[in-house]
Amino acid sequence: MPQTLHVHSRVKDYDILFTDHVLKTLADCLGERKQRKLLFITDQTVYHLYQTLFEEFAQQYNAFVHVYPSGGQSKSLERVSAIYDQLIAENFSKKDMIVTIGGGVVGDLGGFVAATYYRGIPYIQIPTTLLSQVDSSIGGKVGVHFKGLTNMIGSIYPPEAIIISTTFLETLPQREFSCGISEMLKIGFIHDRPLFQQLRDFQKETDKQGLERLIYQSISNKKRIVEQDEFENGLRMSLNFGHTLGHAIESLCHHDFYHHGEAIAIGMVVDAKLAVSKGLLPKEDLDSLLQVFERYQLPTTLERADVSATSLFDVFKTDKKNSEQHIIFILPTETGFTTLAINKDDHQFVEKLDSLL
């Protein structure tokens, strides 16, 4: 499915390249940089799945590889420091490049290293999960966790290019596929109801071209949003639907309990319930959301982990979206979205939250 989307950024424009031939597309992206040093950053899972691909990279380029333990715990300043050490040891200059190959953790981590090493070196993203292809790789957000807080340290630093290949999804476990669908449903529910309806009816096993079309449509929606509001002052805030609660769940629960897309699904359900309670969203829309989550085996409650509303509320207070005095939720409406500001001292809201979980 060779296609290209061009993303306009106030920092730096870049292309999203859809391809069935990753090696050729990467070579085209590198151009004259083929002779420069490249550091490929990936995790153990991706490295073992695609070791032959990394061997081909090593044959064609002046390439080094940084492989780290899989999982969100590696999205840390300690791992950043280890990658800095390798860049320094191999004498990487400002003209050399990083290539990230993996899911959202790999992209966020590698992008953060690229943004901060020598105050910024170029990088290319090759996302290998559905979630990273449709969401985390798009828009330039990079960062790491800090002291148990999700994405606490980061920046907006766009890549030179993003290479999208659905062939990577052939090795993706069903649970991770559903996590990607969760983010696609998020953008569809708020911004593109026809996309939401297509995802509701989609048959993965029999419609590969349909999946490619849905991925392209989802990415196109996010591209449009980040071009209008790159630094999240208005419209891009809508993409945080489900994320206030979702990030708190991720901070308090082990990754085995809830993966990112699953935590966001629970967050979307609670945000939608809040919207229904305030007359902003028809209950039929909430029911539709619950039905499609059930179809993709996405959780809608916190039954897998023993987490209290009080502990969640305490984590809310550290959320990046907050104002000085308020916790910010993104609520879906019949025609889009709105924000809900909850006072950080509103203990009655804790009781309300407890009733919604």
Curated annotation (Swiss-Prot):
EC class (word): lyase
Domain of life: Bacteria
Alphabetized UniProt keyword annotations: Amino-acid biosynthesis, Aromatic amino acid biosynthesis, Cobalt, Cytoplasm, Lyase, Metal-binding, NAD, Nucleotide-binding, Zinc
Amino-acid positions noted as binding Zn(2+) in the UniProt annotation, renumbered to this chain: 183, 243, 260
Gene Ontology MF terms in the entry: 3-dehydroquinate synthase activity; metal ion binding; nucleotide binding
Cellular component terms (Gene Ontology): cytoplasm
Cofactor names: NAD(+); Co(2+); Zn(2+)
Residues that bind NAD(+): 104-108, 128-129, 141, 168-171
Record-linked SUPFAM superfamilies: Dehydroquinate synthase-like
Compartments where located: Cytoplasm
Chief location: cytoplasm
Co-factor note (free text): Binds 1 divalent metal cation per subunit. Can use either Co(2+) or Zn(2+).
A biological process term (GO) from this entry: amino acid biosynthetic process
Pathway the protein contributes to: Metabolic intermediate biosynthesis; chorismate biosynthesis; chorismate from D-erythrose 4-phosphate and phosphoenolpyruvate: step 2/7
Function: Catalyzes the conversion of 3-deoxy-D-arabino-heptulosonate 7-phosphate (DAHP) to dehydroquinate (DHQ).
Family indicated by similarity: Belongs to the sugar phosphate cyclases superfamily. Dehydroquinate synthase family.
Name of the featured protein: 3-dehydroquinate synthase
Taxonomy of the source species: Bacteria, Bacillati, Bacillota, Bacilli, Lactobacillales
